[in-house]
């Protein structure tokens, strides 16, 4: 099964940049989107053979997630069931016979780390959700997790040490999550590869490949040997992020 995750940084804008053709060419079983910035009824974008599920932020033009799938789920849930976290459309969970699929758009800690304390609370609560799912069946987690985990995952680690997405605190939360029974699929197959998934729109960052790897597929440790492919599609434009992929044998 082929899974794609992409922070589209505004789906309306991305649709204007060849999104529909890219979607069809990737031909995924599951296509997860973050930062859709959509409101309900704003865009009717359907693809033959796919069902879609949407979680919208209450604030207009902000955040939001979606999943297109060729496989009808047993159950769908939105958010993590914690009032504090469930106003920004950041999580969708699909349940299947053999696994859960969770797509997530993790809150950015923002300039001057204004939201870092909130981010720490989010991380702990999100980890609890994933562990509760993992106790029932394996979990596939994808999305913009807004952290470059190790120095290999960011072009300029030293100058970004206290910037949102590369603080010691955020990186440690990712370490704790992985140690609790999850595998970073890309690093599992490509332990030494330097590839990024996000580039600032400023300073010609993408042209210079001054990027960050902040988009992930994590899987429960017990299915890591079912990973057959893990890719970062740096060739695909349309957003400041590029799509990431994992292929799993189920």
Regions found by a protein language model. Give the residues of each.
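Active-site-proximal beta-strand elements of phosphoester/diester hydrolases
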Residues: 1-9, 98-110, 142
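Active-site beta-strand/loop signature of hydrolases that rely on acidic residues for catalysis
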Residues: 7, 23-41, 101, 130-151, ...
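Structured beta-strand-rich core segments of catalytic domains in phosphoester-bond hydrolases
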Residues: 37, 42-109
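Metal-dependent phosphoesterases centered on the DNase I-like endonuclease/exonuclease/phosphatase
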Residues: 51, 125-210, 214
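Conserved beta strand-loop-helix elements of the APE1-like EEP
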Residues: 60-75, 193, 205-225
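Active-site beta-strand termini and strand-to-loop segments that position acidic
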Residues: 70, 94-97, 220-221, 246-250
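Surface-exposed cleft-lining segments at the edges of enzyme active sites
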Residues: 81-82, 107-123, 158-162
């Amino acid at each position: 099964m082929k899974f794609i995750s992409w922070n589209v940084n505004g789906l309306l804008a991305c649709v204007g940049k060849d999104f529909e053709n890219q979607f069809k060419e990737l031909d995924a079983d599951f296509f997860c989107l973050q930062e859709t910035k959509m409101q309900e009824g704003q865009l009717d974008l359907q693809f033959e053979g796919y069902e879609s599920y949407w979680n919208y932020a209450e604030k207009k033009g902000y955040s939001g997630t979606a999943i297109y799938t060729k496989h009808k789920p047993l159950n769908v849930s939105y958010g993590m069931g914690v009032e504090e976290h469930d106003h920004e459309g950041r999580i969708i969970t699909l349940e299947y016979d053999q696994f859960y699929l969770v797509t997530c758009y993790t809150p950015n800690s923002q300039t001057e780390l204004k939201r870092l304390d909130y981010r720490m609370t989010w991380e702990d609560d999100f980890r609890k959700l994933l562990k509760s799912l993992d106790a029932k069946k394996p979990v596939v987690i994808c999305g913009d997790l807004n952290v470059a985990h190790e120095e290999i995952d960011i072009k300029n680690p030293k100058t970004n040490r206290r910037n949102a997405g590369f603080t010691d605190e955020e990186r440690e939360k990712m370490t704790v999550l992985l140690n609790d029974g999850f595998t970073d699929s890309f690093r599992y197959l490509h332990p030494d590869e330097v590839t990024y998934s996000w580039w600032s729109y400023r300073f010609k960052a993408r042209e210079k490949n001054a990027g960050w790897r902040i988009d992930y597929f994590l899987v429960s440790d017990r299915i890591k040997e079912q990973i057959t492919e893990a890719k970062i599609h740096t060739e695909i434009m349309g957003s400041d992020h590029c799509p990431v992929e994992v292929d799993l044998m189920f």
